[in-house]
Amino acid sequence: MRDFLKLLKKHDELKIIDTPLEVDLEIAHLAYIEAKKPNGGKALLFTQPIRKEHNQIKTFGMPVLMNAFGSFKRLDLLLKTPIEDLQQRMQAFLHFDAPKNFTESLKILKDLWDLRHVFPKKTARPKDLITKQDKEVNLWDLPVLKTWEKDGGAFITMGQVYTQSLDHKKKNLGMYRLQVYDKNHLGLHWQIHKDSQLFFHEYAKAKVKMPISIAIGGDLLYTWCATAPLPYGIYELMLYGFIREKKARVMPCLSNPLSVPSDCDIVIEGFVDCEKLELEGPFGDHTGYYTPIEPYPVLEVKTISYKKDSIYLATVVGKPPLEDKYMGYLTERLFLPLLQTHAPNLIDYYMPENGVFHNLILAKIHTRYNAHAKQVMHAFWGVGQMSFVKHAIFVNEDAPNLRDTNAIIEYILENFSKENALISQGVCDALDHASPEYAMGGKLGIDATSKSNTPYPTLLNDNALLALLQDKMQNIVLLKQYYPHTRNPICVISVEKKDKSVIELAKNLLGFEEHLRIVIFVEHASNDLNNPYMLLWRIVNNIDAKRDILTSKHCFFIDATNKGVMDKHFREWPTETNCSMEVIENLKKKGLLKDFETLNQKFHLTHSFSTHKEDL
């Protein structure tokens, strides 16, 4: 990792923070704000992490690195090769064609020979590792961060979690948050769809303790590989070897039968008793909301090893944009060829970071026949982690670049019709809070591949439309229309909820189809109608398509307000991840925050911003 830091420093991608900062909130808050700066800000190396304990200050001799993945330039420096070249190699690997001549035969042989790098190579443990075992183990000796005020404690956030099947034939590398309970116990937040969870059930059925090893640091590519959505049974270190074109070198663990990369900075080893679960959380997650307290497995730590000059790698997740934007971009680009094997007419896809990946995806396809887009929708919803996508919008090959925000939105709105909107139900991410049931909820697929027959509405200005609608729905506060020149303008309406569901009250507006097309209701107290970036983030987070959509002849009403019992939503509705103002003021006093108010207004760092009438 230190070689990578030298590279970051050389390219002006690293900021070193020598000011002592607390592992509780201060470090994470500063990294959170840095990641929201233009182009992802800098990677931050905190050289003096501290923890206040019983009126004393504990200092750590281990620096903390954050926002390491948080820019396109840092991704390029990490990969050492253009992402486009990696994508082409993946494409070639997945589509071997029969050779037409001797030269092509030689090329195929070379490509096959290059695959020798995918298998990890066993090596001895480095002799200079410092090792603590049994009673010497103390997780509090690591600068583990508490990232959010309402978190249940400190969490390891960039741990590479190594597991294997009961018969040792399958190995897995994943990345899950890990809550520190005490000096030798960690909570393992793996969800129902993770490979390690499948292994866990094998061990539980056999009534055998499950070995787990957690590595931190080393080559940062290990960490990204831990997040890669590979098919079940394919070991993520094989992907590492494919990208690096060299074998991952793995060393044996001391207290369990697993192996981890020998260059990692920190290794935590132990076993999980599959019959014991402990409450884990809450935790401010990548959705920008806190996930609730739930029972999860617990790792009993037997051994901790680390380098003399080890660096603790961490991240902070919450409201976008953050460094997971860039990690997700690499996933999106590299796995396009793999996704195309399931959907051959797929040209491109895009996961906007304010859709927090599983909440929104845009896809461009070669449309060949009627309902082709709906066929691809079902293909997406049946493939790996794509099955957790809540909202998918499909456009034709003549559509603009998917990342050209205004152009692609206008294209979609010209082609949208309620007849080509498919509302379905299926598995969803366990972190989704809007679904009525855990890990299962509504899905919305929109076929915007061809021109709509929906007539253009008769436009009113915002003030005239507001007066008209307030007469029929008194809890409307303000509204703003977006893309009024299109066939399907979007009217965002802020409301104050009282004693009835918004969808029920929206029926009072069905008589205004002449002026309305897509209508989205949001909470007045927590939404700035002039901030479309944060509006989209809240909207796709807060809806369940089966419950929260009402349609009429030409109108499409969406309730993106917070839900409760009046909406027949009986699960706890979470709070947003907001920075502590006390911590922010402390960071300001230390001279570490600049342009905070601008970023706060833009990305709702400390609280949600509502709109005043004079602002519209």
From Swiss-Prot:
One of its GO terms (molecular function) is 3-octaprenyl-4-hydroxybenzoate carboxy-lyase activity. GO terms for biological process: ubiquinone biosynthetic process. GO terms for cellular component: cytosol. SUPFAM superfamilies: FMN-binding split barrel, UbiD C-terminal domain-like. Gene3D superfamilies: UbiD C-terminal domain-like. Belongs to the UbiD family. NCBIfam families: mena_SCO4490, UbiD family decarboxylase. This is Uncharacterized protein jhp_0985. It comes from Helicobacter pylori (strain J99 / ATCC 700824) (Campylobacter pylori J99).
